[in-house]
Curated annotation (Swiss-Prot):
The lineage of its organism: Bacteria, Pseudomonadati, Acidobacteriota, Terriglobia, Terriglobales. It comes from the Bacteria. This is CinA-like protein. Belongs to the CinA family. Pfam families: CinA, MoCF_biosynth. CDD domains: cinA. InterPro entries: CinA (IPR050101), CinA-like_C (IPR036653), CinA_C (IPR008136), Competence-induced_CinA (IPR008135), MoaB/Mog-like_dom_sf (IPR036425), MoaB/Mog_dom (IPR001453).
Length: 414
């Protein structure tokens, strides 16, 4: 079955508000084997919303509408769904009584306009809202000659998630054909989306019963594999077979076959070896340390880090010889090597990581352009240095450098 998500609210058509509900709903629908075919954002105009609902009913099996269930004049979702379906609205006395009782229990006075939240579409099942005042509604109807499922959900994310998890998921499980879903998430580092797809497309195109999607973000590729079968064992067998073939093809760049982040993998390998890592960051400004310390239990393997932006701190905290900086410059392979070795020794760690570069937008030259980054990984036996030239703005360069640095450590640990 296919679905459409309609997000209601003029604020989401401005630069100041994002529709995060659709991401959550997509994940939930996919877990049930439902494909999201369309996502639509509609402002608070009755004609536009009615048109969007009618269009959705023509082209999908399930319509999930978020927002527009509040008490104000521009909260029009109930009215628009009723108009699109040719049904009436009835104000539910029990809902009104419950609304006032809840307000009294909280010693809150509510205005009469809140009563419009008790308007129920003919034939709808009421979805209780334990986290807010606006009830949702569920409709399982025949529209034209086809069965359609519609759900009206509140806009605030905490209210929507609670209502969907506790009430819509069981209703959907009963309404949908009984299918088992198997999913796998594979991740690769420092490979372009087009390059990755060129390598694996000949493989996944042979598996027409598996939905394969590629998501790319700043040096990270996520491959989502999803298969629906009558029995879970069948679905898992197919997904695992495809995953195995992709793992073999991407062996040089793949770092996770179960959806872990790169920092989780680095910390896992460190802990398995009983080793520790220390980091000296210049252009990344603490991004690497932040990613590592965001993982619970990272203190077992992460010794510590230093942000050594100035030349003085490179010497003070990482022991870099000032003459080395004077001879080669702060952005050089020699200084990256000294950072990695110095921080490893000063933190008594097994591995040291040093990063220095030019994140821009200024500071570059013909010999050392913006985007030039040197990364080094040091052990007591050997120090490896890598030169990379990234493109993009400051944010992109810094995050790519952090991703490259973590992947460099991962490769040394394998």
């Amino acid at each position: 079955m296919i679905a459409e998500i309609i997000a209601v609210g003029s604020e989401m058509l401005t630069p100041f508000r994002q529709d995060t509900n659709s991401l959550y709903l997509t994940e939930k629908f996919n877990s049930l084997g439902v494909t999201i075919a369309f996502k639509t954002i509609v402002g608070d105009k009755q004609r536009h919303l009615v048109d969007a609902i009618r269009q959705a009913l023509r082209r999908v099996d399930i319509v999930a509408i978020s927002g527009g269930l509040g008490p104000t004049e521009d909260d029009l979702t109930r009215e628009c769904v009723a108009e699109a379906l040719g049904r009436t609205l009835t104000r539910d006395a029990a809902l009104i009584a419950n609304m006032y009782a809840r307000a009294a229990a909280r010693r809150v006075t509510i205005t009469r306009n809140n009563e419009k939240q008790a308007d129920v579409i003919d034939g709808a099942v009421i979805l209780e809202n334990g986290r807010g005042t606006a009830p949702g509604q569920w409709l399982d109807i025949v529209h034209g000659e086809h069965r359609k499922l519609l759900m009206l959900l509140p806009g605030p994310p905490s209210e929507l998630k609670g209502m969907f998890d506790e009430q819509c998921m069981p209703l959907l499980a009963d309404a949908l054909p009984k299918r088992a879903i198997a999913m796998r998430v594979l991740k690769a580092a420092m490979i372009g989306e087009s390059q990755c797809d060129a390598r694996i497309a000949p493989i996944y195109q042979q598996y027409t019963d598996i939905e394969t999607t590629i998501l790319a973000h700043l040096g990270d590729i996520q491959l989502n594999l999803s298969c629906s079968k009558p029995f879970l064992a069948q679905a898992r067998l197919r997904v695992d077979e495809l995953a195995s073939r992709i793992e073999e093809e991407l062996d040089d760049v793949l770092y996770s076959s179960q959806g872990e982040t790169l920092e989780q993998i680095v910390l896992y390998y460190l802990e398995m070896r009983g080793a520790s890592l220390a980091v000296a960051e210049s252009c990344t400004g603490g991004l690497i340390s932040e990613r590592l310390t965001g993982i619970p239990g990272s203190s077992r393997s992460f010794a510590g880090g230093a942000v050594v932006y100035s030349n003085e701190l490179k010497t003070l905290l990482a022991g870099v010889d000032p003459e080395l900086i004077g001879s080669y410059g702060a952005v050089s392979s020699q200084v990256a090597k000294a950072l990695a070795e110095g921080i490893r020794e000063r933190c008594s760690a097994h591995f040291g990581l040093g990063v220095t570069g030019i994140a821009g937008p200024g500071g570059g030259s013909e010999d050392k352009p913006v985007g030039l980054v040197y990364l080094a990984v040091s052990t007591p036996e050997e120090t490896t240095v890598l030169e990379r030239r990234f493109t993009g703005d400051r944010h992109r360069i810094r995050h790519l450098a952090a991703q490259q640095a973590l992947d460099m450590v991962r490769r040394r640990l394998m």
